[in-house]
Design a protein with these regions (language model features):
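Compositionally biased linear targeting/interaction segments
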Residues: 1-205
Length: 205
């Protein structure tokens, strides 16, 4: 199975490389965004789907370059509310990734909080960017049900990644345009290179 997965990844990478030579603007009208014909490799059938990470909200946008991104925070809180979740979860998500041990007000949680709950955790609080959105299940106020609601709209890229206006999911665009003017200082951009193939499923690993 690994052999076929690697072959599919290689084909997806080649297609993205070809697209990069044509232009640096990703949109859903390009060849990579269209369903690819099923490939047969050694009598096995391989399906390939390429997705743009920038069509989702990157949870690591909340804290980057040593500070909180207020625009990203307002957006994430609105996304939480739109899915019936508490906006306070955003504070716990921030505390999970920032490097200090000071819990934020309104729902924040550092190592002391998790230790006090007696909750068994596979790892301690990360104090670094999220590696996978599955880590969110460990965060105060979040559970698997909440993650399933958010998963289609999230990704975890270890650097700042603005949403791509050409590929962003409609639900996220609706939230963006309804943000207060003072919070809407980080419009999504139209040129990003953060594509992934179907095997990585940027929304949820």
């Amino acid at each position: 199975l690994k052999e076929y997965a690697l072959a599919g990844e290689a084909m997806a990478t080649n297609l993205i490389a070809q697209d990069s030579q044509v232009n640096q603007v990703d949109s859903l009208t390009e060849a990579w965004a269209k369903p690819l014909a099923q490939q047969t490799l050694n009598q096995a059938k391989v399906s390939i789907k390429i997705d743009d990470d920038a069509s989702r909200f990157n949870v690591n946008n909340l804290y980057h370059d040593g500070k909180v991104d207020d625009t990203a925070l307002a957006f994430f809180q609105a996304l939480l509310q739109a899915n019936g979740l508490s906006p306070n979860i955003a504070m716990a998500v921030l505390d999970w990734q920032d490097p200090d041990s000071d819990a934020r007000a309104d729902g924040g949680a550092e190592a002391a909080y998790y230790q006090s709950t007696g909750k068994k955790m596979a790892m301690g609080i990360a104090n670094q960017p999220f590696i996978s959105i599955n880590e969110l299940q460990q965060v105060r106020g979040m559970d698997n049900e909440g993650l399933q609601k958010l998963a289609p709209y999230l990704t975890a890229v270890p650097y700042y990644l603005p949403m791509n206006i050409n590929t962003v999911k409609p639900e996220l665009l609706t939230i963006l345009v309804n943000l207060p003017t003072e919070a809407n200082g980080n419009q999504p951009q139209g040129s990003n290179r953060a594509d992934s193939d179907d095997n990585s499923q940027s929304g949820q690993d």
